[in-house]
Amino acid sequence: MSGDGFRPFRERVAEDEAQVIAFRIGGELHACDVQLVEEVVTKRKVHRLPDMPPRLLGVLRLRGELVPVVDVAPLLELRLEAEQPAILVTVVGDVRVGVAVDAAHEVVTLSPAEYRPAPLSGAERDQFVVGVVRLEGKLVSLLDLGEMLREQPVGSQR
């Protein structure tokens, strides 16, 4: 994920090295830098715990570790539609966190022509959009998962 070889997304896309993972939230297609995602987990039960904040869907048992699973859809003014969401597992600081999405799609390598810096629309969600990429013939928001998770930190130490 963010080892010694981590370079900013803009640098990598300028050299045809940037990859994104596409996913759906609330019927909308989005993407994020694949280097931010350790793995995608599907068909696993998220266990609800008492007294959890609304944004925390529960915890996922992953190789003996309890990983908190967060619903970021409200930050995008969307709503998760899947009964059993796919989970993008990421690390923020030293905390492993799952991000619930309706479905995870393919990993795509981008050319420089397929990436544009984020336009400002004036919406609150602008703070989470780092760019726009062309996927499946459409312009798609490139999201900063780290910034979304910093909005309301959750999780336990790794």
Go through the PLM ranges and name each one.
Residues 1-158:
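An acidic, low-aromatic, low-complexity terminal/linker signal
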